[in-house]
Regions:
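Class I SAM-dependent methyltransferase SAM/SAH-binding core
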Residues: 42-95
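A short SAM/SAH-binding and catalytic strip from SAM-dependent methyltransferases
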Residues: 105-117
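C-terminal lobe and adjacent flexible extensions of AdoMet/dcAdoMet transferase-like proteins
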Residues: 195-201
Length: 201
């Protein structure tokens, strides 16, 4: 089963599956990202659209993309329920269909853990962000605790079939994608890390 098929199957139950984590761990990361959004904004790997309620008051124009059409359908429904105008485009995060420097802000939350090549996606995010714009990332990353890392190693084994990686650290890969961090922080025990970055040159 490829990634697109897997996420198509997960779309109907994803929000229920993450309902416990959402207010405790995920929503604070979404809020941190949204507070830094400005201008024309792209949400990469939007999933079911959980970011939309946070982004709606910050972005002048909101474009969303996901490889999964089923996930995009959920995001469209959520936007419609909120009276929010979005442009939704099915696309591979590593091959975004927009020209260079097209967006003021590009966002990816809780999805770099699920892509085959996180550096390729970060590089694409950089490419479509204008110089001086922001690339904003939030994701679950390698924990700062021994117990946390042990649990994550087990989750990596379980998630191998559908390409989940619980111990990546996008912050440490920014340079390979032509980005430099301008701000970052993390949740308790570094379960989720939040990063704002700009073009390195």
């Amino acid at each position: 089963m490829d990634g697109r098929e897997y996420w198509d199957r997960q779309a109907a139950t994803y929000d229920r599956a993450t309902a416990w984590l959402e207010p405790r761990l995920l929503a604070p990361a979404r809020q941190w990202v949204a507070q830094r959004v400005r201008g024309r904004t792209l949400d990469v790997a939007v999933g079911t659209g959980a970011n939309l309620s946070y982004l709606r008051s910050r972005a002048d124009e909101l474009v969303v993309t996901d490889q999964s059409e089923a996930m995009l359908a959920r995001a469209r429904d959520r936007a419609a329920a909120q009276g929010l105008a979005i442009t939704a485009v099915q696309a591979d995060a590593a091959r975004l269909p927009w020209p260079d420097a097209h967006f003021d802000t590009v966002v990816c939350t809780l999805a770099l853990c699920c892509v085959p090549d996180e550096v390729a996606v970060l590089a694409e995010m950089r490419r479509v962000t204008r110089p001086g714009g922001l690339v904003l990332v939030a994701d679950h990353v390698e924990s700062s605790t021994v117990l946390g890392r042990a649990v994550q190693r087990g989750l990596d084994v379980l998630g191998r079939r559908h390409g989940e990686h619980h111990r990546r650290r996008p912050l440490l890969r920014l340079g390979q994608a032509g980005l430099v961090p301008v701000e970052h922080d993390s949740s308790r025990y570094r379960l989720v890390e939040r990063v704002a970055a700009q073009h390195a040159s």
